[in-house]
């Protein structure tokens, strides 16, 4: 199955009926040559999904913020009334998800939602197959002031040459209690073309400020001091190795702008 698409689609009705899926995206006039190179084995794919493919459309939390149970004619008229209020019925009141939308996912967008709330997915963020396989070993985390340096050995354990994208996710201490995502992507790196049996040491760094989240009450970006878990992943759902490091606190004071003028029922863990 070749997917010439630009965003996630519903895969529940067919994914168990195909042997393999290649997401080609929309590569333009040269796309056919690239796909042929991958399918023939001339090129070993090493791409990773930049979004989550949910099983069904309605699995995404944002589904509830799109117009529903409205026929096309009425929906079209409603949108036109938004541009030309003189033609709208005099007693018409603004309707949610037609005239305005209050997005309530807050920080739980994409993999942060599916991961933090334990929702099954078809293909997780960061997922992508290769014609070879890779192993991970000797993960280390070294702290120097506000900088954490992460190193891991990546070995081609398969039978053909290939590149691998190493994804570094980080989990904050007490993430659920503090209403933070289960883990977040904080860096990534790609290996060179590794021959079968070849190993490369991949190095990535994370600053304390990279781990900050916004504290609304304090109007500040804050990183809490504590023990953070650094995870080497092959996708948001697949942790290959992990280690911990003690991170110092970090704060950057800012000021409120564009504060909502209505109370939002934001999603919380």
Regions found by a protein language model. Name each.
Residues 2-163, 190, 224-225, 229-233, ...:
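Secreted, periplasmic, or luminal enzymes acting at the cell surface/secretory milieu
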Residues 155-157, 171, 205-209, 248:
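Solvent-exposed residues in well-ordered beta-strands and their adjoining turns
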Residues 205-236:
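Short, surface-exposed ligand- or partner-binding patches at beta-edge/loop junctions that are enriched
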Residues 34, 238-243:
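Extracellular and select intracellular beta-sandwich modules with Ser/Thr-enriched
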Residues 147-149, 199-203, 240-242:
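Intrinsic-disorder/low-complexity, polar/charged segments enriched in Ser/Thr/Lys/Arg/Asp/Glu/Gln
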Residues 176-216:
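Intrinsically disordered, low-complexity Pro/Gly/Ser/Thr-rich segments with frequent PxxP/GP/PP motifs
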Residues 157-177, 182-183:
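Short acidic, flexible loop segments centered on an aromatic residue
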């Amino acid at each position: 199955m070749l997917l010439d698409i630009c965003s996630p689609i519903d895969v529940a009705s067919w994914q168990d009926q195909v042997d393999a899926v290649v997401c080609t995206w929309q590569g333009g006039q040269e796309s056919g040559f690239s796909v042929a190179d991958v399918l023939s084995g001339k090129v070993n794919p090493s791409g990773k999904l930049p979004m989550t493919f949910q099983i069904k459309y309605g699995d995404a939390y944002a589904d509830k913020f799109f117009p529903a149970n409205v026929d096309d004619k009425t929906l079209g008229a409603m949108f036109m009334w938004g541009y030309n209020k003189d033609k709208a019925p005099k007693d018409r009141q603004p309707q949610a998800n037609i005239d305005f939308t209050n997005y309530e996912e807050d920080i739980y967008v994409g993999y942060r939602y599916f991961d933090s709330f334990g929702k099954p997915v078809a293909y997780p963020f960061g997922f992508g197959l290769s014609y070879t396989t890779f192993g991970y070993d000797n993960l280390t985390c070294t702290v120097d002031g506000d900088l954490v340096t992460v190193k891991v050995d990546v070995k081609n354990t398969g039978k053909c040459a290939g590149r691998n994208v190493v994804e570094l996710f980080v989990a904050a201490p007490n993430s659920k209690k503090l209403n933070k995502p289960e883990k977040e992507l904080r860096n990534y790196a790609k290996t060179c073309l590794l021959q079968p049996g070849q190993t490369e040491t991949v190095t990535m760094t994370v600053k304390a400020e990279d781990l900050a989240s916004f504290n609304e009450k304090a109007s500040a970006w804050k990183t809490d001091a504590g023990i953070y878990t650094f995870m080497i992943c092959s996708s948001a759902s697949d942790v290959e190795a992990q280690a911990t490091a003690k991170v110092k606190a970090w704060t950057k004071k800012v000021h409120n702008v564009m504060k909502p003028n209505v109370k939002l029922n934001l999603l919380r863990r």
